Amino acid sequence: KKAVQRYFTIMLEMINKFTDFDTLGHLDYIFRYIRDEAGNPGESHYAYREYASLIDPILKRVIELDKALEVNTAGYKYGLGVPNPQPEVLKRYIKLGGTKITIGSDGHKPEHLAYDFNKCEALLKELGFDGYYIFENRKPIKINF
């Protein structure tokens, strides 16, 4: 738990000091590698509300800076059952006024490019997003679903 708290604290420090970015990626990346005693992915016992006091300032800062939040489909690939960040965090992002998202897949191999993008799109629509963003010359361009 302390490692997770430190992870979020450092992330907020980072985006407070360095603002020359377009998309904040890997918001809850640390959960991809947390396992329970049986070796199961940690995402199943990660509750947004448990870390809301650390996550909300990050989301608010992303919105304040008019940056995008990456939704990464690798969570599906690694058995978490959800993308990163998880749906509760994405709901909160919307509630706080966040609209800009990008979609990534950690496609370090050709077969992982755009991994489960259709599944992710369905989830994002269900949550209330109507599209995602790409960047061209660092300028955001909205792509509607």
Regions found by a protein language model. Give the residues of each.
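Active-site-proximal loop/turn and secondary-structure-junction residues that shape catalytic pockets
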Residues: 28-33, 73-77, 107-109, 138
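Structural preference for beta-strand elements that scaffold enzyme active sites
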Residues: 22-24, 66-70, 100-102, 131
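Short acidic/histidine-rich active-site segments
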Residues: 27, 98-114, 134-137
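Extended substrate/RNA-proximal surfaces in nucleic-acid metabolism proteins
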Residues: 1-64
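C-terminal regulatory/interaction regions
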Residues: 118, 125-135, 139-145
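Histidine/acidic-residue-rich catalytic or RNA/ligand-binding cores of hydrolases
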Residues: 33-39, 79-90, 110-122, 143-145
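Conserved, mostly hydrophobic/aromatic
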Residues: 26, 69, 93, 106
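Anion (oxyanion) recognition and catalysis
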Residues: 63, 94-95, 125
